[in-house]
């Protein structure tokens, strides 16, 4: 018997590497040392930082991956994977430096894997982050035919003096919410149940003219480049930041707020995007459940000094980022630290 007889095709893996090399190399930065194929990937950190603090993150895309496989949409799920990781390390002011991925499947389909990794490379390129390595694991009997799993890993850096840890947050600080591109990569176990209960309406068009499946599969917004530019020009105005992921608005912003303080969020400050309105209506989802499951149209939040909030908003306008003042930091009232109304 051979390894191929057992279900592992080394030649297919090598063919995939050759297919993705040009895509991966487009994401490289000058600090990347060497190419693909080594036992470890190399990145030279010596030239840019005085006192670098490394910030690491890892994530997946949840069961959005199941929907992507169901719909045969493999080309953008890699962007989601990158977004979930790089937006997280961005919260602490870090510039994502490099990214690694893990792709696991029962039987390697080169076209599918190349589409997925192409999306990862594109997400890295859009985030200024080098895709310097990864693992493609072909594991017979571990996954049903046509299915695969993904995980991503990123490392960023920030000057120690510029690290954002929430310590500067004060009562009265303003919450500026930046628009999401859709559900991003959270809440998809509920989304898939609602979609199936509604009869999997692949042809349905939402009130804004966007097809439902396009809205559900819209790639996670990549906030890295605009937010890094904002930190460079208005960093003193930003006291904390939050990436709105699993747990929604209720559980994510509060993670960067010190004890003794809470949040008063004005849900009338922005209009619930059509895809979320459809999900709430079709799934009969209560408001409180919406807030703690989905981003509801707000993908990233700046906690800003009130005197400088207007300048931040002007800078966001200049970058064509939709945004709203969605609330403020208040003194916490007992155990209830987040009020949305």
From Swiss-Prot:
One of its GO terms (molecular function) is ATP binding. SUPFAM superfamilies: PurM C-terminal domain-like, PurM N-terminal domain-like. It is found in: Cytoplasm. It catalyses: 2-formamido-N(1)-(5-O-phospho-beta-D-ribosyl)acetamidine + ATP = 5-amino-1-(5-phospho-beta-D-ribosyl)imidazole + ADP + phosphate + H(+). It holds the Pfam family AIRS. Its EC number is 6.3.3.1. It is an enzyme of class 6 (ligase). One of its GO terms (biological process) is purine nucleotide biosynthetic process. Pathway: Purine metabolism; IMP biosynthesis via de novo pathway; 5-amino-1-(5-phospho-D-ribosyl)imidazole from N(2)-formyl-N(1)-(5-phospho-D-ribosyl)glycinamide: step 2/2. One of its GO terms (cellular component) is cytosol. Keywords: ATP-binding, Cytoplasm, Ligase, Nucleotide-binding, Purine biosynthesis. Its main location: cytoplasm. Coiled coil: none annotated. NCBIfam families: purM. Belongs to the AIR synthase family. This is Phosphoribosylformylglycinamidine cyclo-ligase. It comes from Xanthomonas campestris pv. campestris (strain ATCC 33913 / DSM 3586 / NCPPB 528 / LMG 568 / P 25).
């Amino acid at each position: 018997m051979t390894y191929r007889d057992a279900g592992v095709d080394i030649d297919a893996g090598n063919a995939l590497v050759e297919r993705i090399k040009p895509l991966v190399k487009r994401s490289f930065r000058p600090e990347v040392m060497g190419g693909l194929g080594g036992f470890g990937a190399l990145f030279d950190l010596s030239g840019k930082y005085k006192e670098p603090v490394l910030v690491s993150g890892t994530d997946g895309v949840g069961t959005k991956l199941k929907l992507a496989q169901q719909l045969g949409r493999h080309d953008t799920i890699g962007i989601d994977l990158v977004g979930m990781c790089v937006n997280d390390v961005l919260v602490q002011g870090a510039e994502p430096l490099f990214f690694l991925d893990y792709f696991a499947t029962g039987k390697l389909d080169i076209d599918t894997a190349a589409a997925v990794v192409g999306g990862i490379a594109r997400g890295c390129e859009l985030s200024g982050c080098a895709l310097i390595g990864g693992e493609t694991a072909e594991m017979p009997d571990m996954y049903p035919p046509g299915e695969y799993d993904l995980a991503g890993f990123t490392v960023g850096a920030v000057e120690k003096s510029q690290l954002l840890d929430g310590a500067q947050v004060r009562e009265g600080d303003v919450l500026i919410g930046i628009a999401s591109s859709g559900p991003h990569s959270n809440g998809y176990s509920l989304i898939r149940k609602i979609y199936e209960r509604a009869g999997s309406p692949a042809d349905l068009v939402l009130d804004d003219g966007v097809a439902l499946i396009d809205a559900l599969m819209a790639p996670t917004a990549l906030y890295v480049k605009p937010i890094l530019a904002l930190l460079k020009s208005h960093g003193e105005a930003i006291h904390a930041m939050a990436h709105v992921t699993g747990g929604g608005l209720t559980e994510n912003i509060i993670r960067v707020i010190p004890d003794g303080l809470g949040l008063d969020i004005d849900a009338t400050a922005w209009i619930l995007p059509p895809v979320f309105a459809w999900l709430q209506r079709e799934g009969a989802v209560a408001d409180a459940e919406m807030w703690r499951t989905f981003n509801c149209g707000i993908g990233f939040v700046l906690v800003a000094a009130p005197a400088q909030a207007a300048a931040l908003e002007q800078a966001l306008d200049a970058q064509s980022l939709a945004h709203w003042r969605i609330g403020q930091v208040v003194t916490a009232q007992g155990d209830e630290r987040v009020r949305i109304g």
